[in-house]
């Protein structure tokens, strides 16, 4: 590797840290520290160096039966929830909790915080339920927050069914995964957040547009709000 590329590689490594960041976010952070480096050069070194988002290995859980998605005919029949991670300009990690109604692809809410343990997950869901009503089922992956005793007790007390996807089968949560991709491209990777408040502000603005203005092919080219009307 040429000497100049080694310098770029070291600059990339210095901003990657241990938190999840997309390629575009990496490029922006490198350029913030090294304004003289062009985006195309950083991208080339990034790709040639084989940088990728690493996966954490968790303790193996007993698997559950296949759980394919069935699109509901009414709202509040099944929600899907999932986490995402990003990083502030200062380097501190943030997390988001995304809640989607499978019926009309509406995003019921996005909680943005430094950490989102099961307690905060429950608080976020209770705020959404207060505004939109209670779902029959909630679909999740096998994350520790969802498998926790606190979250499982809350589901039972509220008579909400838990629809857990199989480990290693993200396609069983394809609707929220597709939403996550859009949110990452439009918001997380497109911006450098100066603070938690900044991330929340941009997320709130984008969320309104997503629900009220963005047309969805799967909804006959209607917005989520219009489809549910």
Where are the regions a protein language model picked out?
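Short loop/turn microsegments at loop-to-beta-strand junctions
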Residues: 94-96
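Basic, flexible linker segments flanking DNA-binding modules
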Residues: 1-78, 169-170, 223-229
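C-terminal domain-tail junction helix/linker
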Residues: 158-160, 181-229
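Short, acidic, Ser/Thr-enriched surface-loop or helix-capping motifs
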Residues: 101-102
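Two-metal-ion RNase H-like nuclease active-site motif
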Residues: 77-86
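RNase H-like polynucleotidyl transferase catalytic core
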Residues: 138-142, 157-175, 191-196
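Acidic/histidine-rich, metal-coordinating catalytic segments
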Residues: 125, 132-148, 222-225
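Active-site beta-loop-alpha junctions of metal-dependent nucleic acid enzymes
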Residues: 88, 92, 110-132
């Amino acid at each position: 590797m040429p000497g100049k590329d080694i310098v770029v590689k070291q600059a990339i490594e210095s901003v990657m840290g241990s938190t999840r960041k997309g390629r575009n976010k990496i490029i922006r952070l490198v350029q913030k520290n090294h304004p003289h480096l062009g985006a195309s050069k950083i991208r080339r070194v990034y790709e040639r160096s084989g940088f990728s988002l690493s996966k954490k290995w968790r303790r193996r859980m007993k698997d559950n039966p296949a759980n394919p998605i069935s699109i509901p005919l009414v709202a509040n029949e099944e929600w899907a929830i999932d986490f995402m991670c990003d990083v502030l300009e200062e380097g501190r990690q943030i997390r988001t909790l995304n809640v989607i109604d499978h019926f009309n692809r509406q995003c019921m809410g996005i909680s943005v915080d430094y950490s989102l343990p099961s307690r905060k997950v429950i608080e976020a869901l209770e705020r959404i339920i207060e505004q939109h009503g209670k779902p029959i089922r909630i679909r999740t992956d096998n994350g520790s927050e969802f498998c926790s005793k606190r979250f499982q007790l809350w589901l039972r007390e509220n008579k909400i069914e838990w629809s857990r996807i199989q480990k290693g089968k993200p396609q069983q949560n394809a609707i929220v995964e597709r939403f996550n991709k859009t949110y990452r491209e439009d918001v997380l990777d497109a911006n450098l957040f100066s603070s938690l408040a900044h991330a929340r502000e941009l997320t709130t603005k984008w969320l309104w547009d997503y629900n009220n203005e963005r047309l969805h092919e799967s909804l006959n080219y209607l917005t989520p709000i219009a489809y549910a009307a």
